[in-house]
Amino acid sequence: MFIISSKNMLLKAQRLGYAVPAFNIHNLETMQVVVETAAELRSPLILAGTPGTYSYAGTGNVVAIARDLAKIWDLPLAVHLDHHEDLADITRKVQAGIRSVMIDGSHSPFEENVALVKSVVELSHRYDASVEAELGRLGGVEDDLGVDAKDALYTNPEQGREFVARTGIDSLAVVIGTAHGLYAAEPKLGFAALPPISERVDVPLVLHGASKLPDSDIRRAISLGVCKVNVATELKIAFSDALKHYFEENPDANEPRHYMKPAKAAMKDVVRKVIHVCGCEGQL
């Protein structure tokens, strides 16, 4: 097996009415757990990393580990650039073997966003890499960068149609009230915004900020056209909480192979639950 584009993966999800989970990876253990669980459940999978993740782990290391895991588990993997903004950085990573890109120009005016995204599409498609872009502005914190809720903007359906047509993107990240990070109160998603977008846009839709959303909200979003669901913070919390608990019980512990076991088990529970909610088990 090998590293693939996420394009056909998402088109199949769109056709059959489920969603592909994109789990943000942070270290070797995250990658091991996510891939192993997806393989056991025969689920399609996207491994996503922010610029901070690739800086921490090294793009070459991420690609090499993903290729090895794909071979071990006989699982095609999409390794994805999440919320990247710089064309030169994206170019280097695509040339290193990445085949799925999210270019985020959502903080820019519409015309600037279109121009940036179009340039990334032209570059990425030469390498058979798929491109996702965001229209609207998501609240919350990602990679230590924050957007206040008051500054978040929903995706405009008519602009969405124009954006997809002019840029040639393969999937569209929509903003309907989700946010990066965990929610201080139960979010109220704008589900009514999804049908007008789906009617005007023929590419798969992406939902960011799905950590700790009620399962019913995720399922409803999928029923209205969402084909990719991003989960990041929920994995980090499970991992870190399990580590904290282990050291509370074993304050003198110093063997990573021991204390990583409960941390990986906690993440595995999250991955299994998300795959079930997305309805993608057995869809390889």
From Swiss-Prot:
Its EC number is 4.1.2.40. InterPro entries: Aldolase_TIM, Class_II_FBP_aldolase, FBA_II, TagBP_ald_KbaY/GatY, TagBP_aldolase_GatY. It catalyses: D-tagatofuranose 1,6-bisphosphate = D-glyceraldehyde 3-phosphate + dihydroxyacetone phosphate. One of its GO terms (cellular component) is cytosol. Dihydroxyacetone phosphate binds at residues 181, 209-211, 230-233. GO terms for molecular function: tagatose-bisphosphate aldolase activity; zinc ion binding. Pathway: Carbohydrate metabolism; D-tagatose 6-phosphate degradation; D-glyceraldehyde 3-phosphate and glycerone phosphate from D-tagatose 6-phosphate: step 2/2. Induction: By galactitol. The keyword Lyase applies. Zn(2+) binds at residues 83, 180, 208. Its cofactor is Zn(2+). Binds 1 zinc ion per subunit. The active site is at 82 (proton donor). Pfam families: F_bP_aldolase (PF01116). PANTHER family: D-TAGATOSE-1,6-BISPHOSPHATE ALDOLASE, D-TAGATOSE-1,6-BISPHOSPHATE ALDOLASE SUBUNIT GATY-RELATED. Belongs to the class II fructose-bisphosphate aldolase family. TagBP aldolase GatY subfamily. NCBIfam families: cbbA, PRK09195.1, PRK12737.1, tag_bisphos_ald. Forms a complex with GatZ. Catalytic subunit of the tagatose-1,6-bisphosphate aldolase GatYZ, which catalyzes the reversible aldol condensation of dihydroxyacetone phosphate (DHAP or glycerone-phosphate) with glyceraldehyde 3-phosphate (G3P) to produce tagatose 1,6-bisphosphate (TBP). Requires GatZ subunit for full activity and stability. Is involved in the catabolism of galactitol and D-tagatose. This is D-tagatose-1,6-bisphosphate aldolase subunit GatY.
